[in-house]
């Protein structure tokens, strides 16, 4: 006589596995039994203290930011995080909730990639004196940073390095590992569900062995700040079941899949496609060199009953996994190679200039706001996360003044309205 209301007898067929926090089922944020044992198994697989999230990397990012803030305050400093401009919206929302300052890193290359090098990071640390650094690796397009050299810079200047590794849980199982914790990061989150055999919402929070033990002791407490009090046992069960797969068959399956994906990429290049270099398990096509927008290629794929992870005017992103069959990859090859190449499209994304800050993120997000047409927003202060596509660096951040440059970028990506601070 306890929750859930379906009593294990619902219409979908899996309700019997959907438990709640009854005797013997343990509690995610006060784990002493089977959940604690399962998380320890995951910790052994990743070589560091690892904790489950049933709310994706969003909960992990919020928790990492809490640790970064608490670490700064413990040293008598106001939290100020130096972050790559391609940070996920959950990082920006965390800034509003936790009231920390952000200094943005734009990188020194195309603004869509936010490629940050060690020398850029060191210069920024010296100039802005942050209490921590937060970077995304890999990004949505599959670009990889040199985490090892970036981590060395952070250690040299005694600032913590947190990595949003949402797209790279599988990197731990490469030879050699490219996982951020193995390369020197202090904190890291993985969206297990993105690249591993885990249900949507399943994620990991990893803490390095070198991180202050105080934060390891408090991590579950911090996670509770943002989490539902009813975490999904179905998602936890999938994280637990994945442990055995990761410990036994996954490395070999991943190796075979990487070889198949590499072969497919080579075939596509021979056909004339431009494939971005980066992580091995992501196929990112820069479509305009082939004479099409990403939207046009995506529509053709969907006519072949193949649904891409992402597409826009410039790119299409495909995310195979070891659980795609060889027939899946062959069907993808046949569909893409059935498209005839056309003259290159020369229109490129508009250049994004750095925006002027009028107030901090917290002030902007919690201000009274109104919605305006983008074309009428020049000079207004943005009050919401406006970007409509994951790969792009945000054209304007809450608290920044909307410029002609940011308006041009928003229009390019089809953003028609924007919320601004009410005057």
Q: Which residues does each predicted region cover?
A:
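N-terminal glycine-rich, Lys/His-bearing helix-loop that initiates the first secondary-structure elements
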Residues: 1-16, 391-394, 422-423
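Conserved PLP-enzyme active-site core in the AAT-like
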Residues: 12, 37, 55-274
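Conserved N-terminal alpha-helix of the aminotransferase class I/II PLP-enzyme fold
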Residues: 15-59
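Short glycine-rich or small-residue beta-strand-to-loop segments that form or flank ligand, phosphate
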Residues: 51-53, 133-136, 316-321
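Conserved C-terminal alpha-helix-loop-beta "cap" of PLP-dependent enzymes
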Residues: 77, 266-415
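Short, compositionally biased
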Residues: 99, 415-423
